[in-house]
């Protein structure tokens, strides 16, 4: 069965290829076309590329605000990916009832640097902490009542 299927597909493929070669070679080619064709094709490609590049440049200028918004979304997606990678660490810290202040001390992050550019791990844990402390189960826990970061 497999041999029959393979041979049938091979025959069909060879016949289709043979028909394509016959159709492609029906037109006679002159010596002038043979010599001039690559040059003309090159110029047409360059001209069409220039027209295409001008159109895309105009479109890019019009869509620059959309591109900036997309870049911001991509950066947010990257940061969410990093936070997803660190989720087990966040869960461990939360199970140890660590506040964001405890995490900051464990990561040896000074407070003055957090105001300028917070660590992604620390800011991810703060977000994780806020979300999980809003759950009914943890709402009244003493470590969730601390709001000092």
Curated annotation (Swiss-Prot):
What does its record list under induction? Expression is up-regulated at later stages of infection.
Alphabetically ordered keywords of this record: Host cytoplasm, Host nucleus, Secreted, Signal, Virulence
Subcellular locations according to the entry: Secreted; Host cytoplasm; Host nucleus
Q: Which residues form the signal peptide?
A: 1-24
Q: Which residues form each disulfide bond in the chain?
A: none
Residue ranges annotated as transmembrane are none
| Coiled-coil ranges per UniProt | none
Gene Ontology CC annotation, any one: host cell cytoplasm
| Residue positions of motif RxLR-dEER | 52-78
Its biological purpose: Effector that acts as a broad suppressor of cell death to interrupt plant immunity. Inhibits cell death induced by cell death-inducing proteins, including the PAMP elicitor INF1 from P.infestans.
Q: Relay the domain remarks.
A: The RxLR-dEER motif acts to carry the protein into the host cell cytoplasm through binding to cell surface phosphatidylinositol-3-phosphate.
Q: Report the family membership.
A: Belongs to the RxLR effector family.
Could you identify this protein by its name?
A: Secreted RxLR effector protein 17
């Amino acid at each position: 069965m497999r041999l029959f299927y393979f041979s049938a597909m091979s025959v069909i493929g060879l016949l289709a290829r043979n028909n394509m070669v016959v159709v492609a070679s029906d037109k006679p080619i002159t010596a002038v076309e043979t010599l001039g064709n690559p040059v003309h094709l090159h110029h047409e490609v360059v001209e069409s590329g220039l027209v295409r590049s001008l159109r895309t440049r105009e479109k890019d200028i019009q869509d620059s605000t959309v591109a900036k918004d997309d870049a911001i979304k991509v950066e947010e997606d990257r940061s969410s990916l990093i936070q997803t990678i660190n989720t087990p660490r966040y869960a461990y810290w939360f199970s140890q009832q660590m506040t964001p202040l405890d995490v900051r001390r464990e990561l040896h992050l000074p407070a003055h640097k957090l105001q300028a550019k917070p660590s992604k791990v620390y800011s991810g844990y703060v977000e994780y902490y806020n979300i999980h402390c809003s759950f009914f189960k943890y709402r009244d826990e003493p470590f969730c009542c601390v709001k000092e970061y």
